[in-house]
Amino acid sequence: MNTSITARELFEQQRERLGLRWAAGKSGEKRELEAGNTVSRRPSLAGYLNAIYPNKVQILGTEELSWLDALEPRQRWETIEKIMQSHPLALVLTRNQPCPEDLRAAADESGTPLWLSPKRGHELLNHLSYHLARTLAPRVILHGVFMEIYSIGVLITGEAGSGKSELALELLSRGHRLVADDAPEFTQIAPDVLDGTCPELLQDLLEVRGLGVLNVREMFGDTAVKKNKYLRLIVHLTKPMTEPTPHGYERLTGDSGTRHVLDLDVPLITLPVMPGRNLAVLTEAATRLHILRTKGIDPAAMFIARHSNLLERRTP
């Protein structure tokens, strides 16, 4: 999923927090920053004024303006022109410093947004870098029901009619929490972290065949829903195989694997759906098993080792 942000959107999102005021270059409010073309390149998303490797949002503090003032008139003009030619998303002056007229004129002429803020440079840098990194982070929508089970994020997937929503409803009645139904959105906010959220349109809602759309917050209370959760496990519901497996190894280890989501391999446990099986209990057990494995405890490996030791002791 492609993500982007315009200068106007960034200004509106951070105006109150950073006290931003628009000083010049308002014609460039539609200037856009796209994730695919910026995140992997050398320039930072936000940083102090850099004319060699220009940042996407250039911050001008007292030292940067003093450096510009120390330049010869022609060199100063060439430097300002070079800054504008790099097409930054915006320029931000710290501590409400008076904006130099030549900088203001260049911003208006080139359509480069120029903002003023009462904040210090490091505050602007921290807030803008974090906000842009989150906004432009890689993201994907996966079909399924995303829940918090035993304090970890679990995505329940499966074909249409496999019982995902019914399973989610039973898990809710057992005290677990809903994050998103049908179309949870996952954002890679760190190299090993996928943050799952619910689209605004679907918040608090769960669709169950025969019942229609249910408002989980109204039915189960505020504690039954959660705004976001990190994805740690995928439980996939599938129809049982018609042919027997060629070996019994899966009877020991279960049907476990991984699913590649963005840049991460997420642990995957597959549960066959058959009449009479309590999927809620099985999903809870799968979650507990995953928690044990993250602690280095693998019951199947322990049994295999115990069995091997027993055979060795009985071998003459």
From Swiss-Prot:
Write out the catalysed reaction. Answer: [HPr protein]-L-serine + ATP = [HPr protein]-O-phospho-L-serine + ADP + H(+); [HPr protein]-O-phospho-L-serine + phosphate + H(+) = [HPr protein]-L-serine + diphosphate
Cited function: Catalyzes the ATP- as well as the pyrophosphate-dependent phosphorylation of a specific serine residue in HPr, a phosphocarrier protein of the phosphoenolpyruvate-dependent sugar phosphotransferase system (PTS). HprK/P also catalyzes the pyrophosphate-producing, inorganic phosphate-dependent dephosphorylation (phosphorolysis) of seryl-phosphorylated HPr (P-Ser-HPr).
GO molecular function terms noted in the UniProt entry: ATP binding; magnesium ion binding; phosphorelay sensor kinase activity; protein serine/threonine kinase activity; protein serine/threonine/tyrosine kinase activity
Ligand binding (ATP): 158-165
So where's the catalytic machinery, residue-wise? 143, 164, 182, 251
Q: Tell me the protein's name.
A: HPr kinase/phosphorylase
In terms of SUPFAM superfamilies, this protein maps to: HprK N-terminal domain-like (SSF75138), PEP carboxykinase-like (SSF53795)
Q: Which EC number(s) does UniProt give? A: 2.7.11.-, 2.7.4.-
Which parts of the chain span the membrane according to its record? none
Q: Which gene encodes it?
A: hprK
The kind of enzyme this is, by top-level EC class, is transferase
A Pfam family: Hpr_kinase_C
Give the family per the record: Belongs to the HPrK/P family.
| Cofactors that this protein relies on | Mg(2+)
Miscellaneous information on this protein: Both phosphorylation and phosphorolysis are carried out by the same active site and suggest a common mechanism for both reactions.
Give the residue ranges for region: Important for the catalytic mechanism of both phosphorylation and dephosphorylation.
206-215
Q: Which UniProt keywords apply?
A: ATP-binding, Kinase, Magnesium, Metal-binding, Multifunctional enzyme, Nucleotide-binding, Serine/threonine-protein kinase, Transferase
Q: Where is this region: Important for the catalytic mechanism of dephosphorylation?
A: 272-277
Free-text domain note: The Walker A ATP-binding motif also binds Pi and PPi.
